[in-house]
Amino acid sequence: MAISALLLTGVLASDAIAQPAPRDQAPRTLPNIAPAGCMVVLGQPTVDYGHFTAGQLNRDTAHRYELERRSVPLTVNCPMARAIALRVSGPARHDGAVRFAGAGAVGIVLRNVRVDGDETRIQNPDSPQGPQAQLTLRPGDTVVLEHRRVGRNLTAQIDVNPEVTDADVRVNDQTVWSAVVQFELVNP
C-alpha cells in the first residue's frame, strides 16, 4: 500500500538560552510505497515550527499552549479508479490523541475532500456518525469515502494543531518536540 508521513517538529528553549540550536539531524521521511501504481503525497511532508520560547506561545485557560495551526495538502493518485481509504498511524497518548512533546497532543482534521474534482464526504467506518465534510483523526482511525465511492484522484487538506502542557514548557535547556503521523492507502 502507499504510505506518506507527516513530520511535525519544534525546538523549545528556556528563556535563558533562547538561541538557535545546530541542526545535526536531517528530517526523517518515509518512502512512498506504491504497489498498483497508487501514490500518497503530502504537499509539505515536514511542518517545522522552528525555535521558540514558552513566552512566544498562546496559553489557554486549561494551561495548555497552542502552536500555530497549519494546513498540509494531501493527494492520492491512482492509475485506475478504486475505492480509497486511508489509515492514520502515529504515536498515541492514553486518550488516543497523537502524542506531541511529553504530554501534548496534535489535533488532526481531514477536510475539503474532493474525488476526481468533486466534493465528497468522508466517514470513519468504526464510528456511529455518518458521512461528514471533515473528520478529526486519531492513530488507528480509517477514513473511507461516502457510499464507498471510487475514484482515481483524491485531494484534501490536513489541519494540524499541536498543543503542549505546562509541564512540557518547563525546560532548562533546548528540547526538541516531534511527532510522525502516517497516512496509508488501504483497502476499505
Region spans (language model):
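Gram-negative bacterial Sec-dependent N-terminal signal peptides
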Residues: 1-19
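Mature extracellular/passenger domains of Gram-negative fimbrial/pilin and adhesin proteins
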Residues: 17-188
